C-alpha cells in the first residue's frame, strides 16, 4: 500500500512537471526568467520519503540522466 502511494505521488509530480515544461509562450509576450523556488522536490516531498525519486523524475523531465537530493535539500541533476 505504501509503495503504491509513493508511485502515485511520483507519477503525479512527473505529470505536473511535464505539463509545466511543455507550456508554449504566448505570442508577443517577452519571456522573463521567473524566480524558481529551490528545493521543493527535495524539501516538501521528503516528508513522504519520496524526495530522491521526485528529484530524479524532475531531472529526467528536464532531459538529464537523473538526480539526487543534497543534505541542504537541493535537487542536483546529473548531465
Swiss-Prot record:
Q: Where in the cell is it found?
A: Secreted
**Disulfide bridges in this chain:** 42-69, 55-75, 59-77
Record keywords: Antibiotic, Antimicrobial, Defensin, Disulfide bond, Immunity, Innate immunity, Secreted, Signal
Gene Ontology cellular component list = extracellular space
The family database entries (InterPro entries) matched by this protein are listed as: Defensin_invertebrate/fungal, Scorpion_toxin-like_sf
Question: Which coarse location class applies to the principal site listed for this UniProt protein?
Answer: secreted
Instruction: Specify the signal sequence span.
Output: 1-23
The Gene Ontology biological process terms listed for this entry are:
defense response to Gram-positive bacterium; humoral immune response; innate immune response
Recorded family membership = Belongs to the invertebrate defensin family. Type 1 subfamily.
Q: Which PANTHER family match?
A: DEFENSIN (PTHR13645:SF0)
Can you name this protein?
Answer: Defensin-1
Amino acid at each position: 500500500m505504501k509503495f503504491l502511494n509513493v508511485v502515485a505521488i511520483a507519477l503525479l509530480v512527473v505529470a505536473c512537471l511535464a505539463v509545466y515544461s511543455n507550456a508554449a509562450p504566448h505570442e508577443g509576450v517577452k519571456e522573463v526568467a521567473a524566480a524558481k523556488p529551490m528545493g521543493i522536490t527535495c524539501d516538501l516531498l521528503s516528508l513522504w520519503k519520496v524526495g530522491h525519486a521526485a528529484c530524479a523524475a524532475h531531472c529526467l523531465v528536464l532531459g538529464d540522466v537523473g538526480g539526487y537530493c543534497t543534505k541542504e535539500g537541493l535537487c542536483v541533476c546529473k548531465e
